[in-house]
């Protein structure tokens, strides 16, 4: 492990208040309109931050909007964890939602698949679903317990974290699933993203580690200096590294593809960073205490 702690100066990190502390900014994604879209998990809303003037527009949706991702149809798609539905909103604010086949399934992760559809996890039902752009839903058994985040892999499959199965899952578009157990007990993986090296990278919220898995199933784990950091979401950054949020320590981390880790503090240790995404050449993360943080990526 090679971890360096650094402090951002005021030009490197800025925080923007976008809601009251009770609304809960949770996940975020850049939309096809160039704006930053984010979920307000406790308010039942999806919001848009204008890229020019920073104005925030809030759109009411179903209960518990959680993860959000752009779709191939020019809309934003998101999971409604407490409403047990999949939501869709256009850049103009037109909203629709679709019911999975399994009731009370607790949809959480969502991503655009390699087949032109959106894929999502049903964490409470141990299933993975697929919804087409016109709302047709199909489902497959997940290859393990409590599927959480998921992403499209470079091999044409969907990869997901199996939070309570302590494994990483792979699912082909036709529903064939494989689970790869993690070597660390109680790792409880959550976030996952495709890396620039052709592997999948994921967070181990229960073990304070960042993991890497190749498309053939070879696993590597990188421990953080603080085992209680609770790494949550992860994304590929614009500089060839992976960036992740440390929910338990109020920090943002960066890991290179050869395993070098750097950790940066945000304004407060209790700011609760969750989702992280690339937008306007920088990293943005959602702070559940009511703000979005913009982190300028070092050269």
From Swiss-Prot:
Active-site feature positions: 274
InterPro entries per record: Streptogrm_lyase, Vgb, WD40/YVTN_repeat-like_dom_sf
Alphabetical GO biological process terms: antibiotic catabolic process; response to antibiotic
EC annotation from Swiss-Prot or TrEMBL: 4.2.99.-
A molecular function GO annotation: carbon-oxygen lyase activity
Annotated positions binding substrate: 232
Cofactor: Mg(2+)
Keyword hit for Glycoprotein: no
Any Pfam family: Vgb_lyase
Presence of the UniProt keyword Metal-binding in the record: yes
Keywords: Antibiotic resistance, Lyase, Magnesium, Metal-binding
Family (UniProt): Belongs to the Vgb family.
Assembly description: Monomer.
Name listed for the protein in its UniProt record: Virginiamycin B lyase
Native organism taxonomy: Bacteria, Bacillati, Actinomycetota, Actinomycetes, Kitasatosporales
Primary gene name: vgb
């Amino acid at each position: 492990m090679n971890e360096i702690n650094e402090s951002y100066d005021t030009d490197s990190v800025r925080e923007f208040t976008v809601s009251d502390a009770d609304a809960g900014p949770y996940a975020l994604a850049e939309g096809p309109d160039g704006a930053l879209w984010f979920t307000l998990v406790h308010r039942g809303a999806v919001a848009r931050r204008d890229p020019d003037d920073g104005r925030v527009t809030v759109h009411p949706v179903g209960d518990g909007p959680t993860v959000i991702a752009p779709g191939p149809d020019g809309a934003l798609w998101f999971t409604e964890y407490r409403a047990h539905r999949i939501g869709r909103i256009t850049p103009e604010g037109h909203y629709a939602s679709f019911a999975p086949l399994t009731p009370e399934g607790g949809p959480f992760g969502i991503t655009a698949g390699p087949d032109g559809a959106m894929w999502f996890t049903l964490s409470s039902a141990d299933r993975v679903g697929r919804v087409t752009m016109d709302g047709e839903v199909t489902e497959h058994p997940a290859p393990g317990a409590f599927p959480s985040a998921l992403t499209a892999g470079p091999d044409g499959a969907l990869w997901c974290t199996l939070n309570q199965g302590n494994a990483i899952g792979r699912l082909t578009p036709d529903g064939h699933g494989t689970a790869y157990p993690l070597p660390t007990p109680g790792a409880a993986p959550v976030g996952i993203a495709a890396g620039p090296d052709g592997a999948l990278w994921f967070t181990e919220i229960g073990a304070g580690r960042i993991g890497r898995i190749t498309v053939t199933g070879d696993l590597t784990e990188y421990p953080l200096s603080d085992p209680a950091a609770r790494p949550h979401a992860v994304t590929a950054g614009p500089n060839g590294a992976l960036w992740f949020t440390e929910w338990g320590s109020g920090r943002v981390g960066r890991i290179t593809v050869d395993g070098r880790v750097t950790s940066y503090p945000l304004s407060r240790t209790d700011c609760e960073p969750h989702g992280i995404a690339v937008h306007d050449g920088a990293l943005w993360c959602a702070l559940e205490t009511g703000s979005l943080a913009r982190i300028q990526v070092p050269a």
